[in-house]
């Protein structure tokens, strides 16, 4: 998400990305902060200084989204981010793992064979599901202290864009074949006090071997949960690639569907 925002929203400030100095060594946290906010001066009053630092930190979109533990002298701050992401779990039944050697283009010494520098292990096919929650209330109190609005609608829009495009857009040989497959986004009403369970274990992914060879994402158990709290739901969005994927089981719910490739409504 950070990498996508850094590349495609260059006007946004990001605190927790690697930066290098003139010697090509990574900057420290304090050096990175100083680079982002060169106008920041040490306030004589410790409380005022901490609030000034907090205001600066909240101008960074990654901190508004994910929070931070910021530890520099005189301004230790912990911000509980509105966005929480769990570890991905593979919900595809077949787990075919294979390994391959990585060879260097050079010999270790004159006359020797090409050097093997290691091996990499890959999964033939997997469909990793991540449960993501967004609770703006996590940051309300600390944003109020810093006279900041906290997480904005524009922040959420950029988050969703990154969640539907970030993996596909990432340039890396290790992720070849990895793409954003689907995003199910459920928004509760502003006054709702309900908390939805983790959807990860409620999803399964199979292959439609009889017809199209598409990957079929089954959401029947999620639909059962959402049907019980339908009065609390403001909207449901589903982003997926209809060329390669089918999503089933959300019948009975009002769902706005979008093509994850084009971004257009379907």
Language-model segments: what does each one mean?
Residues 2-266:
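RNA-binding basic/glycine-rich loop and surface signature characteristic of RAMP-family CRISPR effectors
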């Amino acid at each position: 998400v950070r990498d996508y925002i850094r590349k495609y929203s260059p006007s946004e400030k990001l605190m927790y990305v690697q930066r290098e100095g003139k010697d090509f060594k990574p900057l420290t946290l304090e050096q990175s902060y100083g680079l982002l906010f060169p106008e920041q001066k040490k306030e004589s009053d410790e409380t005022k200084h901490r609030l000034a630092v907090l205001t600066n930190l909240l101008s960074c979109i990654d901190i508004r989204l994910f929070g931070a533990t910021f530890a520099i002298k005189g301004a230790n701050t912990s911000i509980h981010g509105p966005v929480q992401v769990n570890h991905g779990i593979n919900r595809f039944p077949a787990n075919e793992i294979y390994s391959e050697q990585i060879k260097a283009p050079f010999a270790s010494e004159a006359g020797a064979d090409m050097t093997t520098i290691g091996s990499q292990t890959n999964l033939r096919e997997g469909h990793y599901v991540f449960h993501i929650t967004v609770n703006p209330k996590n940051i309300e109190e600390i944003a109020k202290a810093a006279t900041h609005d906290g997480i904005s609608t524009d922040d959420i829009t950029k988050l969703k864009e990154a969640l539907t495009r970030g993996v596909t857009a990432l340039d890396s040989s290790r992720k070849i074949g990895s793409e954003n497959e689907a995003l199910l986004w459920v928004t509760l009403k502003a006054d709702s006090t309900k908390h939805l369970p983790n959807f990860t274990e409620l999803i399964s992914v199979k292959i439609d071997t009889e017809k199209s060879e598409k990957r079929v994402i089954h959401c029947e158990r999620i639909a059962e949960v959402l049907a019980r709290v339908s009065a609390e739901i403001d909207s449901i969005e589903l982003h997926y690639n209809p060329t390669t994927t089918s999503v089933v089981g959300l019948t009975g719910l009002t769902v706005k569907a979008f093509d994850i490739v084009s971004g257009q409504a379907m």
